[in-house]
Amino acid sequence: MSEYKYCVGIMSGTSLDGIDVALCKIRGSGLDTDVKLIDCQTYPYPTNLLCDIKKSLDLSTSNAQLLCSLNFKLGIEYANAVKKLVAANNLNLKDIAFIASHGQTIYHQANNERGFIKSSLQLGDAATIAYECQTTVVSNFRAGDIAAGGDGAPLVPYVDYLLYRDKDKSRALHNIGGIANTTIIPKNANIDDIYAFDTGPGNMMINRSMEVLFNQDYDKGGDTAAAGIVIVDMLQELLDNPYLKQKPPKSTGRELFGINYTDKIIAKYKQNKPEDIVHTLTIFTAQSIVRAYKDFVFNKNKLDQIIFTGGGAYNKFLIKTISDLLDVEVLTFEDIGESSDAKEAIAFAVLGNETLNKSYNNIPSATGAKSRVILGQINFF
């Protein structure tokens, strides 16, 4: 097998909780991929940049000038994050073979409707990152899948298959970021056996309620939710969301479960205690995940374990609620000796490596694409 090379994966998700940057060593490709995490850090967005991102997400405050400028501001910020992590590990930028950057999702149009076609926009100019870091950058991963008729999401299942398949255990890898998504990997699977989809909201609605009601970024450990009780009418309204009944492959985003929707729910039930609203949103998130397994997975596959990753894996109340509702072993990434925070940044490093090796790196059964394609666009340096 080839020698290890240093690479960096960058992920900034819909939770807007910062820039996850993973410094890795990688060699091989495809089923022979061998990747080792050296270090991963999350760098918070500067306040003014976070403000610009939030403006760009709201149709009432977004505009072309803002998006144009933000694209390059994010490129500079991502490059600065890479420089910090590389220096902290006593390496030089010239040691880095490539960077793979997902970018900051601004809008994800999952369906053709009202004259709009399937599309997805991630900002964070790759040419700027390449110039600032003096290395090759792979970016814009979702476009290739959308061009092939897919949703452009979820993309991480390909990496889940490469790194976490098992000949004896059927498992699901479930990421709880802003949106929650699952990858189903039957035991002894080949790539055509894999399927994946977005189950619904992850941290998105919980985080927004904490911001509005408690002026906090998130519910640490789920402590606020644990102090509340269910608002029955509110929970039923949330569970009636049509997305939960939609069959996979499917994907969603803040367009459906973001600020506008969450704020309407909070306003409608504002006469209730704040902790009860957070509790109910957390129960809804848990039940949307559980329903996804009961409606779309268990009738096809008997799972031995579900492994949770992402920021939501640290919400103890959320994970316990899910575990109590499922008759299957529930683990977090930390339980298997890995980092929930680092998983998606590592995944995009692997996807970038596949791109540079000219390997197909989408899974049509997950995204709905007509065929397998090579994802990512390359800025050589």
Curated annotation (Swiss-Prot):
Top-level taxon of origin: Bacteria
What InterPro entries does UniProt report for this protein, alphabetically?
Anhydro_N_Ac-Mur_kinase, ATPase_NBD
Which GO BP terms apply? 1,6-anhydro-N-acetyl-beta-muramic acid catabolic process; amino sugar metabolic process; peptidoglycan turnover
Q: Which reaction does it catalyse?
A: 1,6-anhydro-N-acetyl-beta-muramate + ATP + H2O = N-acetyl-D-muramate 6-phosphate + ADP + H(+)
Q: Which UniProt keywords apply?
A: ATP-binding, Carbohydrate metabolism, Kinase, Nucleotide-binding, Transferase
What pathway, per the record?
Amino-sugar metabolism; 1,6-anhydro-N-acetylmuramate degradation; Cell wall biogenesis; peptidoglycan recycling
Gene3D superfamilies recorded for this chain?
A: 3.30.420.40
EC annotation from Swiss-Prot or TrEMBL:
2.7.1.170
Q: Which CDD domains match?
A: ASKHA_NBD_ANMK
Give residues annotated as binding ATP. Answer: G13, T14, S15, L16, D17, G18, I19, D20
Picking any one GO molecular function of the record gives: ATP binding
Q: Which family does it belong to?
A: Belongs to the anhydro-N-acetylmuramic acid kinase family.
Query: What job does the chain carry out?
Result: Catalyzes the specific phosphorylation of 1,6-anhydro-N-acetylmuramic acid (anhMurNAc) with the simultaneous cleavage of the 1,6-anhydro ring, generating MurNAc-6-P. Is required for the utilization of anhMurNAc either imported from the medium or derived from its own cell wall murein, and thus plays a role in cell wall recycling.
For this protein, the record's PANTHER family field holds: ANHYDRO-N-ACETYLMURAMIC ACID KINASE
Q: What is this protein called?
A: Anhydro-N-acetylmuramic acid kinase
The scientific name of the source species is: Francisella tularensis subsp. novicida (strain U112)
Which gene codes for it? anmK
